[in-house]
């Protein structure tokens, strides 16, 4: 009986361990929901706001996150990257073009949906495979580096909200 209990005591923690893929899937979902919540808090008439002229507007910042998500998740997974609508790609090249809230939030949401699908499709081999043309990283590195990229820009967006007197959502992880 003692051997059985000892075996179970040692085996049960192994069953509860989370795989890297599961952890990535969980955190991509959380960071997506959190980032979209930040995006939705900015009033539509403030999507062109920039704290200083050299910074991206709030709308451009949200679209920049979405575009980077598409690139990273496509490279990591091997899935075909969805096309970026012309209006949005033009706005990222020309900072004088405004991006409206509905368009930005939809694009951002769609980018996280794509990333959630991409992460779900990943095999251990894909996580370890090197991908990229000019910048080569493993699938895991693409996902993790752009996870942190999203956090960086979400932090900027939270400052934009605070400048406008809007309290960002509480931090979640």
Residue ranges, per PLM feature:
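Short, contiguous alpha-helical
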Residues: 25, 29, 33-36, 46-90, ...
């Amino acid at each position: 009986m003692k051997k059985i209990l000892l075996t179970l005591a040692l085996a049960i923690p192994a069953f509860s361990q989370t795989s890297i893929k599961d952890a990535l899937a969980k955190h991509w979902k959380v960071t997506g929901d959190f980032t979209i919540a930040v995006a939705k808090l900015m009033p539509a008439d403030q999507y062109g706001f920039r704290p200083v002229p050299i910074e991206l507007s709030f709308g451009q910042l949200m679209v920049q996150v979405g575009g980077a998500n598409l690139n990273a998740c496509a490279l990591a997974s091997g899935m075909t990257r969805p096309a970026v609508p012309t209006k949005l790609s033009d706005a990222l090249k020309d900072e004088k073009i405004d991006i409206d809230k509905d368009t930005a939030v939809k694009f951002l949401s769609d980018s996280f949906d794509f990333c959630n699908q991409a992460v779900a499709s990943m095999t251990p081999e894909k996580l370890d495979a090197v991908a990229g043309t000019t910048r080569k990283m493993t699938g895991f590195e693409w996902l993790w580096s752009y996870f942190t990229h999203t956090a960086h820009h979400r932090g900027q967006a939270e400052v934009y909200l605070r400048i406008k007197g809007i309290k960002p959502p509480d931090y979640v992880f």
